[in-house]
Amino acid sequence: MTAVKQVKRAVVKAIADAGGMAVESYSAEKFRMSERAVTAVGARETVIEPRGGFEYLGQRADEKTQEVREVYGRRMALTLSLDIYAPRELGADGCETAAETVMQALMTALPEGLRLREMQLGQTEWDKVTGMFRLCASAGYAAYFLCERAEDETVFTDFVLKGTGKERE
């Protein structure tokens, strides 16, 4: 799974765990059927920081096999778009209420490897394409990824967002 997809999934999960509704991708048709406010999480900007290449962090022994693995890290800066849509029945207040849930989730419920740097909220406006109210927001993050390599291997394992475990697609 790509680094950006791992971050988007972590953000969607944090919002859902806080009681909000969030999706990684969306269509206007899908949103029109929703009775709740929905946050669409997308990638706006991604930067591998100059020092974001492979950084040697040390060694870790596997608890089960006692095999020693080298641990490397990678750092990324990214900005996500967080477009919050609310049906006409909820009004602009539906976006505002959902934005509060999103902000709370992003300040308190993210995995260890994802640190919120900044968050910006725009004004709620009527979106003609979806026929819903929309509040455009963005969140800037520092993301930290880890990978391991066994002593006898020359290939690195996949980089995984710190604090999320080894998810596979």
Regions found by a protein language model. Give the residues of each.
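Small/polar-rich, solvent-exposed N-terminal microdomains that initiate assembly or binding
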Residues: 1-63, 165-169
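Hydrophobic beta-strand residues in large extracellular and virion-surface proteins
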Residues: 11, 15, 23, 80-84, ...
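Generic secondary-structure microfeatures
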Residues: 43-47, 80-88, 106, 110
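Short, charged, solvent-exposed linker or helix-capping segments at domain edges/interfaces
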Residues: 53, 148-158
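Short secondary-structure capping micro-motifs at structural edges
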Residues: 63-71
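Oligomerization/assembly interface segments of phage tail-like spikes and tubes
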Residues: 70-90, 131-145
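Acidic-leaning, charged glycine-interspersed low-complexity segments
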Residues: 95-152
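Short, cationic low-complexity segments
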Residues: 154-169
